[in-house]
Amino acid sequence: MRLSVALISSFQWKKRSSKAIMRRGRKRRRRRQRGEDFFVAPEIPLDLLIEILTRLPHKSLMRFKCVSKQWSSLIRSRFFSNRYLTVASPLRPHRLYISLVDHKCDSREVCHSPRESVLLSFSSPSSFDQDLTTMQGMGGLHMVTLRGLILYIVCGKACLYNPTTRQSVTLPAIKFNIFVQGNEHSLLYFLGHDPVLDQYKVVCTFVSSSSQDLETIISEHWVFVLEVGGSWKRIEFDQPHTPTRSGLCIGGVIYYLAFTSMFQDIVVTFDVRSEEFNIIQAPLVLSAYVDSLDFIEYGGKPAIFYHTSLKENGLVDLWVLENAGNWSRTVLSLQPCQLHLVDNDIPLTLVDTTQNGEVVLVPSDLCSPFYILYYDIQKNHLRKVEIQAMPDHKKDGIKGIPDFGFKLMDKSESIIHLET
């Protein structure tokens, strides 16, 4: 009897379980049949997605590459990298870079001795303590910034660093043809961008001169295209010269100051796309040997900012290179009430210009407190910003009192992937 009751109970339980399973199956089928009535979120249009992503911080973009292959391909594409550069965002303040080097080995010289360096980055002098980023082994005395990239020299080799992605690339060494034992040798690298073909190129000028007769100068020039499989290519140019500045690139043309074997001051131009050099006569009153001048961008044109008289009488000469290759001169006179902002004891070095047209000047020596001068050419206004806490170079791994280089990256965050 008990066995019969147990069998009946087991049968009823299985029956109820079967009915429950059937009911759940019917519900699933009904759900599948009504699936077309469910709300399906539409995909975000590509143009809207790009607009959203270009306004995000670079750290978010690096994480979002893991969302899908489509997002990864989009973020890594050259189109998106260029779009990201052009979008102005309040989340991207300009950044200041100070490079400390452990000894006075001029990075323009051909040397092979190891050295230590550290690159310090902060968004503004007021946030130096809170927003200081330290990058060991990066930077140099002669740095070039362009479209979010930093070019510097380490023992004769050109190095590129993207502070946004933290990617660094060291270009191969060049086998120069004019290396003469016993001569003085120097080299300088330039960074250019061709907006038509969207190509980045590094230009190297190597100079060999007699140590006894500096009037005898021979030079050779090399170009490296930043692309997969890139290599150094020699460019012929029959005008030997010695560069004295790192120059700047405007509209696909690199401009830099130099002098010839006859100690004639010239301006050298290099067309990034055609890879052709040209020479323009510099203003006769200027000298390439003077430290108190350099190229700036003024109104979309290259201009020489000559500030040798800024400390004494508050005067600045601005020489603008016009389309016809002629120079136009403007004399700027600082307001008398602002002359006290300039320290007469320490020479000033021109760093760069901001997107607002302010010329950035810094002392040529590490002083305490260290300060930055912002000179607004349009308003003829000078302001001084002090950095209360300069970095402790001993704490940062730099022994002794280092030399330093200073550069400005004005709201340019590049997510381009460097390939060579």
Swiss-Prot record:
InterPro entries: F-box-assoc_dom_typ3, F-box-assoc_interact_dom, F-box-like_dom_sf, F-box_dom. Coiled coil: none annotated. It comes from the Eukaryota. Residues 38-87 form the F-box domain. Pfam families: F-box, FBA_3. NCBIfam families: F_box_assoc_1. This is F-box protein At5g62510. It comes from Arabidopsis thaliana. The lineage of its organism: Eukaryota, Viridiplantae, Streptophyta, Embryophyta, Tracheophyta.
